[in-house]
A protein has these predicted regions:
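A short alpha-helical cap/connector motif
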Residues: 23-239, 243-265, 271-317
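Intrinsically disordered, low-complexity segments enriched in serine/threonine/proline/glycine
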Residues: 10, 18-19, 162
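Extended, charged/glycine-rich binding lobes that contact polyanionic ligands
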Residues: 13
Length: 317
């Protein structure tokens, strides 16, 4: 309904920026209250989204002077072509959204508050339905597919290693839907994904087996910067969707940024999730190793090619 209102307003010659910002903010309010979050968080999220809508530009790539980034907007972000594996992956998503099984859920991230386990580690444990995990944790279809297109675009002769593979890293496997999207684009690519919750990781593995995807290496346990530094030598594409705190996000990014090359891309999810995540994102944008960033509100993309001037973009999706 909201998208129809926006298109109607455009056809009638209305003020696109203000009207679209207003309508999409109403949509965001609906989503926020559906998630039943506390009112302070709800107000912060809505305000953050409204600010993004009012300041975001370059919806079709206009105003982006870098040919490389303009191509990314045109061929990755705005591409609407589907791929053969996507329909099967979306069926997995539907099954997860209807899965009433309960599992022991372990959280090492923003959801733990000040709780501490018996062994002294900061973690939270409770019983959750798989369907609830899916509703809260799975990336929306359009973003998961955009990540898949990103992997495909980068692997199309741009980043491939000597044996033709990309090294794709994901922090926060969840139920494995986004992982499947990225891995399915080219079976030669190697995907290393990290998940803190053993029960959730097992379900993700079941999903990949059902899809026939075999190029995923899932590593289970608390995700630490030391672990990443030890495990990874090279990063072509990275997706950070774990531990939505300032400390965790900065630690992950700092390690990954030492493993990249000029054509690598790091994607940070939920950059406006809370004040801590926004602080982490702002510091990432200012990092001297970074040349360009794209704020899509839901996620941010980080580029490292020194051939282009440093520039930060906000784009409406």
């Amino acid at each position: 309904m909201y998208r129809e209102c926006i298109e109607t307003n455009k056809k009638n010659g209305g003020s696109i920026c203000i009207f679209e910002s207003f309508v999409l903010s109403l949509q965001k309010i609906t989503v926020v209250f559906a998630q039943k979050m506390d009112w302070q968080t709800a107000i912060y999220r809505v305000g953050s989204y409204l600010r993004h809508c009012l300041t975001a530009r370059h919806t079709g790539g206009h105003g982006i002077h870098s040919p490389y980034l303009f191509e990314w907007v045109r061929l990755v972000m705005r591409d609407e072509h589907s791929y053969y594996a996507w329909e099967k992956i979306e069926k997995v998503r539907e099954r997860m959204l209807g899965d009433t099984r309960e599992v022991e859920f372990v959280d090492y991230g923003a959801g733990i508050g000040n709780r501490e386990s018996e062994n002294g580690n900061r973690e939270a444990r409770d019983r959750r339905k798989v369907s609830d995990i899916a509703k809260r944790s799975l990336a929306k279809k359009k973003y998961a597919q955009m990540l898949a297109r990103l992997v495909n675009w980068l692997g199309d002769g741009r980043l491939a290693m000597g044996d033709g593979r990309l090294m794709v890293v994901e922090l926060g496997t969840s139920l494995g839907v986004t992982t499947a999207y990225m891995a399915a684009m080219d079976k030669r690519n190697k995907v290393i994904t990290y998940e803190g919750c053993p029960a959730v990781a097992e379900i993700a593995k079941e999903n990949w087996k059902a899809l026939g995807i075999k190029n995923i290496d899932c590593r289970v346990g608390e995700i630490t910067a030391d672990m990443l530094d030890r495990d990874l030598e090279r990063v072509d594409v990275a997706f950070i969707d774990a531990n939505h705190t300032y400390t965790g996000t900065r630690a992950y990014f700092n390690v990954l940024a030492e493993k990249v090359h000029p054509k690598s891309v790091i994607v940070v999810d939920d950059i406006h999730y809370n004040k801590e995540m926004e602080k982490a994102w702002h510091e990432i944008c200012e990092d001297e190793r970074v040349t360009s960033t794209m704020d899509l509100y839901q996620m941010g993309l980080v580029f490292f090619d020194k051939d282009y001037w440093k520039r930060d973009y906000r784009i409406r999706v």
